[in-house]
């Protein structure tokens, strides 16, 4: 077939990507483009833009696993269209989530005589937020029953200065006073001797860090539990512990199973963690577990009929 000016053809799907008209155009940055782009061209342009980023497989410093088996990746790709929060439409996905909650609660030694409760989250930051909110609501409910004026001053949260930024966000979002126990060269984790200097009747809880980003240390949660146990004997309102196990919550049970940092301790009422701090798991999920239903105020649990479940 002969071609000339009058029957000149444009790009086709077989046209080499860098021979297409679109490949010579800039990717839109402020508004949608006027013309569509072939999917193979769009894929190549975006992939090339990502070439300037770091290589995730060489990342040894931000607690992110960078490899999963091909079958796991395939399963993820095959379920991308599912909105997992729709419990009635995807009941088996919900069942798998429940199994994970059971397994994690078991790893953290949830007492058999209590009714633990937990959920998945989009990451450990959301898990921390939920754990913090539960402490705030529970403190407020108990304080009101004791006749305390819950509006006279801000409630406060105690944590070491090695905290992860999500706790600062939590305190800003929910109007909580953040009380920081300083770390120094002699105390590269929570200084147990100083904790009670920051605790009072308006303390919603103490956050213990099972893995500090800056130092790699664990707070001495067993010692903290003993300290608060004595304090709570005479306190007007008891102070619980939430363990932020984002960094260590899913590997401590394996590397040091005898370490007492979890629900074996009386005053540890909730624990949060990050799923991707566990080996061979991509980023994208977090978990929070409460030792017993009493530590998760009922007003934070929602019955949603159109999504077919409890949130």
Predicted regions and their residues:
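N-terminal entrance/gating region of PLP-dependent enzymes' catalytic architecture
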Residues: 1-115
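Conserved beta-loop-alpha segment that forms the PLP phosphate-binding cup at the N-terminus of a helix
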Residues: 94-97, 101-102, 116-150, 166-168
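PLP-dependent aminotransferase-class I/II
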Residues: 122-125, 144-145, 150-226, 260
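Short acidic, glycine/serine/threonine-rich loops at helix termini
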Residues: 130-133, 168-173, 217-220, 251-256, ...
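Active-site-proximal loop/turn and secondary-structure-junction residues that shape catalytic pockets
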Residues: 163, 212, 245-249, 277
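Catalytic PLP-binding core of fold-type I/II PLP enzymes
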Residues: 218-256
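Active-site C-terminal subdomain of aminotransferase-like
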Residues: 254-257, 263-311
């Amino acid at each position: 077939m002969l071609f000339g000016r009058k029957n000149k053809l444009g790009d086709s799907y077989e046209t080499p990507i860098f021979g297409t008209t679109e490949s010579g155009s800039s990717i839109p940055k402020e508004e949608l483009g006027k013309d569509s782009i072939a999917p193979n061209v769009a894929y190549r342009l975006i992939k090339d833009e990502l070439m300037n980023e770091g290589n995730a497989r060489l990342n040894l410093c931000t607690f992110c696993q960078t490899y999963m088996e091909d079958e796991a990746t395939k399963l993820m790709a095959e379920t991308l269209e599912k909105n997992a929060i729709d419990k009635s439409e995807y009941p088996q996905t919900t069942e798998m989530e429940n199994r994970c909650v059971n397994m994690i609660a078991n790893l953290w030694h949830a007492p058999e005589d209590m009714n633990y409760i937990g959920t998945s989250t989009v990451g450990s930051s959301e898990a921390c937020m939920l754990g913090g909110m539960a402490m705030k609501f529970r403190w407020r409910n108990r304080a009101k029953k004791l006749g305390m004026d819950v509006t006279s001053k801000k409630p406060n949260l105690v944590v070491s200065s090695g905290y992860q930024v999500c706790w600062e966000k939590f305190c800003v979002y929910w109007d909580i006073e953040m009380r920081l126990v300083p770390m120094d060269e002699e105390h590269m984790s929570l200084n147990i001797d100083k904790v009670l200097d920051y605790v009072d009747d308006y303390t919603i809880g103490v956050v213990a860090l099972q893995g500090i980003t800056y130092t790699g240390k664990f707070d001495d949660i067993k010692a903290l539990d003993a300290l608060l146990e004595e304090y709570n004997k005479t306190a007007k309102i008891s102070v619980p512990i939430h363990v932020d196990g984002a960094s260590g919550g899913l590997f401590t049970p394996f590397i040091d199973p005898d370490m007492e940092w979890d629900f074996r301790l009386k005053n540890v009422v909730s624990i949060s963690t990050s799923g991707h701090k566990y080996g061979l798991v991509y980023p994208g999920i977090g978990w929070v577990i409460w030792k017993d239903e009493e530590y998760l105020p009922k007003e934070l649990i929602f019955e949603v009929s159109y999504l077919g479940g409890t949130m």
